Every structure is written in structure tokens, then in C-alpha cells.
């Protein structure tokens, strides 16, 4: 980054500091990952200069012959990975992908059935502070009070009662396998569309390690980062009969020019996901998450649903007499990055919370394995149990430093 360093020392310094943070801390935020240098090179390419409103072969600008190739590569690779009939890779984010689906099939005030945010849903699944909850009449389903797993009988009962036009499946903090086939059966029974938001599990689906929602859903949305390990962005997969409507909802509906440099980075990441070693990577994500969950439970920590089937773990910290906010802060102080998170049947404010959400996608990309998961579980428990003991916290910092020093990253940057 010699040019940047010469041109803007302040921005360069901030980027260098962030690189140092990523190298020196253990990244356990479930929605984050470390992309390859190839993905970063594509995103930092000259494609950032090109306007390309429209779609390949139907642009509103000239000079799009090369970016057309890039977008076609991205779309074709997604179709190959997930078996989708139609793909739109232009959404700037998962939220905009969800918005486009809503705009395609819903009218203002239509009823939608979505997962309660504190039970594991997402802001765009009907939260009253989000456009989805403002524009549409969302009815919430959740998890069982004892098992913390989705109660499909309750979903069916609410679907029959409220007759939603759309049912939204998928979550941002649900550590168990979701039965998409059952969701489609429920949707068909009440005459609703089914949209699956697979943002968190897309990489696991790509590797064949989580049921694929594409055969069951009318629409599938996802981010392209998280377990898929691409750049930050979104995309939509749908049945061919909805292709024109979806494309119009993205452009000119809610977006203008696509970010062609990001789409190039998406294409590179999709190519990586088609390689044999990506399945090994995804398997390691799950193995690491399950080993970490076991270690946390051995240390006496309480996990929502009692464990995990995917990359994600939700810790209930109430029995430690601390809040999620305090847990996030003290773990960050020792070099472990997590996020505070609501838990099912939450009583605390979303700015405070009773839980912490962690995930293993990023540490797995870094090369951490089962032994490292045992050590991380021990450090987390040690830190949370001794969160006011500076001597204990200093010991935790040293243990984190030992771990991160064994797994250098981005050494060419």
C-alpha cells in the first residue's frame, strides 16, 4: 500500500492498526471471516472505476463487455454451488437482498411470519426498528422454552391463524439445523411464499454440510461473507419464474449501479467455494464449533440449546452474574473479539443483553484446530469468571498472545 501511505497517512495508519488488531486478537464474531488475498485483490481492482447499471448484455452504459464477463462468472458459479435456477449477485448487502424479495411479492401492510429477533432472527425479519417491521405486519415465531429449538408445530399454528403471504426462515443467532423442507410444507399448507435467509450458513450449505434451502424455497437470500468467506455483500437465488421481478426489484428498484469490484471479489470467493478443500474447511468450522461448545460446557458455561450443529454458539452468561455487554468488553480486553447478543426469552435491553454470540469461521480460516478450541474455551471461562481480577486478565492476554503467534496471517500485506 505504498501509494496509500504516501497519499493519506491517516487512513493508512488506521488500516495498518486494523491489520494489527486482526493479527493479534482471536476473532470469534460469528458473522466475520478472513477473505483470501485473491478476493482482496479483486475488490481492490480497476473494476471500482466502472459504472454498469443494468445486467449483462442489457446495460445502460457502454464499455461493459469485461464486467459482463465477471458478473456472468459470479452468477454461473452460484448456480453450480447451490443448484439455483436464477441468481442476482448485485445486492450490496444481505439486508438489501431481503428488501428486494419483500418488494417483489409484498404490498405495504401484508402479513409475514418471521423469527423473533431475541430468539435468533434478524432485524430484517420484522424488527419494529427496521423497515421490515415498519412496512409489513410481521407475526413472530420462536423457539421452545425448554429445548431452544424451533417449534415447527407452533410455526404451523401461527401460519394457520394469521395466513401470512410470506414465511421467512433463517436466523442470525440459531445454532441448530433448520428444517427447510418442513417450512415449505407449512408454507404450502397456508398458501404462503417461503423465503430462506441463509446468510450465516451459506458456506456450510455450499459444502453440503447443512440442508440446502434452494430446492424448498421460492426465494433464498444470503450474504457473501460469513461462512462463505467472500467480500461483504449479498445475493438472491430464486425460481426462474421470479427472475425478472427480482432483477427489477434490485435495479432500478432499490439500487443504482452495481459494485463491480465487489462482484468480482464475490466471483473469486465462489470459485474458492467450488474447490475440494472448501468442504474440508467447512467441516473444520463445524468440528471446531462443537469442540469449543464442549469445552465451554465443561467449564460450567450455559449454552443456548445445549450446543451447536453449525458454526455458531450462543452463551447465556446470567449464571456468571454478568451481562452480555460486560462479557463482550472484558473478552475484548484480553484479545478475544465477540459480540453481546440477546438470548431466547430475553429480559435485558438489546444494548445490555444476557448472552454472547461466538462463531468459528474466522479462527478456522486462520488455521486453528481442536486443541486451540480447548484453549480458547479455557481462556473464555477463565476471563468471564474472573472479569474483575486484573491479574487473571493479564494471564488471559498472555495466553491469547501465545495462540495468535502460532498462526500468523496476511504476512504479505
UniProtKB/Swiss-Prot annotation:
Pathway: One-carbon metabolism; tetrahydrofolate interconversion; Amino-acid biosynthesis; glycine biosynthesis; glycine from L-serine: step 1/1. Its cofactor is pyridoxal 5'-phosphate. The record marks 225 as: Plays an important role in substrate specificity. Transmembrane segments: none annotated. It comes from the Bacteria. Keywords: Amino-acid biosynthesis, Cytoplasm, One-carbon metabolism, Pyridoxal phosphate, Transferase. This is Serine hydroxymethyltransferase. It comes from Bacillus cytotoxicus (strain DSM 22905 / CIP 110041 / 391-98 / NVH 391-98).
